[in-house]
């Protein structure tokens, strides 16, 4: 049964990507992604809203009711009150994806109609608690852009192709499938766009297997957490792994994230809705996490998962006020201007609760470089905040082949020790990238859970040793011995084989000499 479902899922993904590739024409897929993802989202929220009303009326006894067939006036009067408070937005029947796609091919005002619909959906939340969660959601879905074509008819043709393409995808009955098929399709598209985009794609999507590992690590030994936070959330893939891995009652107060890039910020919010996370259970903000943190009032967080940009530039000590910032001041040094890695780490530590855990993907150089980075490492080690350092295989991420490292932070450690795990061999080779398999993830989590020495796999090291003997070097290779996989040679056996070979050679020489002597006599 599982194999059949997996085959069906792969076929659905193949069709979705074929449609996305076909409708973009000569436009670069990366530049076109917001239209495919945005229209898929539009279809989802339309079907979600229609199903919301249909289900309620059917349960009340009106089995013939269809929200999509109502007049806008009836819907406005009978269904809008209370809906925005519950769902966060409202869509009139005429604005539903189903009704728009019916005459999309003949609609000479399609691009303007869609722009007005998207604007109306956003405006429906004005004055309600969901206003900030909906505001600007469709900003990147510009139906007037020349990306779609140079003339209005060309724009309308491209938009009609997208609408009909998305409409042709069979997600099954919405009531039965709910959001699973939509959410899965959205994640698949994001992953493919990221993979094809290379380096730029890696900025907004963390591969699902790495996301799954981080989600597992932060929950080891925990039955529930208050909320989960990603300070550089991209498209929200890391946050959503927490939802996929754990039941709702385990994550009590929802999902929080911040993202500096506008497109990624909108993708993350759409991603939340597509995975059935209601507006009142997530809070995604836009802005520079280091210079304009948006969740100071919501901290602390029991779980933080993050894959911040590697060694990007920031203002650092160019802003003299930052050394007094509560997030950075405790270490006594700011991260270097050319490498903001430890600024993100200190930010996460500041937002972490006393019983929480953070798992952060890092560039490996930060664990051994000197200067300010060494000073910050010393602060983390001396205050016993480093729970584990885990080296990952290379080529796991889109756009970079470097072998990254996971830094695990906690504030409630019982021992002044740090666990180092060498997971560099835990992968399966695929066409373009290495991937973590389910068994790889289980093995890494098991090593972390057991928190002990395992030959060639993990080393539990006293913090005093890290400081006094290793000068606060946190590289895994410093502590976990590499297994010598060369064939071991038994000298005694080798000497015996050599002696036997020499004896054979001597015997053969004697035989040859005898033959030569006989030949000489024959002459």
Task: Briefly describe each language-model feature range.
Residues 2-3, 7, 298-523:
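A conserved structural/catalytic subdomain of Rossmann-like adenosyl-cofactor enzymes
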Residues 1-213, 217-218, 280-289, 391-395, ...:
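Non-catalytic, mostly N-terminal accessory regions of nucleic-acid modification and defense proteins
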Residues 114, 181, 228, 336-338:
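Glycine-rich, flexible loop segments associated with nucleotide phosphate handling
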